[in-house]
């Protein structure tokens, strides 16, 4: 996806990002252990992308329709302070995130992959999705990309989609991953 001047400006001024979990931070597959525990796999490539975004000072949120303990565990590991899980109304959760951190909705990107994410995407200043998001979501985000407020990753959910977004934010801010990695992450 070509980075337009308006997208570059949007990525440069972005203050926060809210992620759906399943299909964005994971590959969307559901696996159970022999004891019946739900298992999720996260990519270290995406984990590094989140770490770089944190070091740039972006506020983070996880907003998931699933209410699994893995969401809390991931948030704790990544120092993500806002978690809304088991929610059908992701737009309301996004508004709560904005209010809690003193953000305007147009300062936030919502990164989702399926139709239940569209409601939050519609009120966010920017939306992003993995390459393998639902067709309706890819169309919506692609339409927003025409005005610089949408980002369709070249990678699939759970295997680099978030990292490509992080790399685009770094490029828009004339930052290298190496230099940002050396920065101290905000508490």
How would you label these PLM feature ranges?
Residues 1-19, 175-187:
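Non-catalytic pre-domain segments flanking phosphatase-related domains
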Residues 20-22, 28, 66, 113, ...:
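Fold-independent oxyanion-binding glycine-rich loops
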């Amino acid at each position: 996806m070509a980075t337009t001047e308006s997208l570059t400006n949007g990525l440069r001024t972005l203050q926060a990002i809210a992620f759906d979990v399943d299909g964005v931070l994971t590959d969307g597959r559901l696996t159970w252990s022999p004891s019946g525990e739900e298992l999720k796999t996260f990519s270290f490539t995406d984990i590094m992308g989140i770490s770089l975004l944190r070091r740039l000072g972006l506020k983070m949120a996880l907003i998931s329709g699933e209410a699994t303990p893995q969401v809390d565990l991931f948030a704790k590991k990544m120092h993500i302070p806002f978690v809304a899980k088991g929610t059908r109304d992701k737009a309301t959760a996004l508004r709560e995130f904005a209010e809690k951190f003193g953000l305007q909705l147009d300062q936030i990107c919502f990164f989702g992959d399926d139709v239940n994410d569209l409601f939050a995407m519609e009120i966010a200043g920017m939306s992003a999705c993995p390459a393998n998001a639902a067709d309706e979501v890819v169309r919506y985000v692609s339409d927003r990309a025409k005005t610089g407020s949408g980002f369709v990753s070249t990678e699939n959910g759970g295997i680099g989609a978030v990292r490509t977004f992080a790399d685009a934010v770094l490029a828009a801010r004339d930052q290298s991953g190496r230099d940002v990695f050396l920065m101290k992450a905000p508490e």
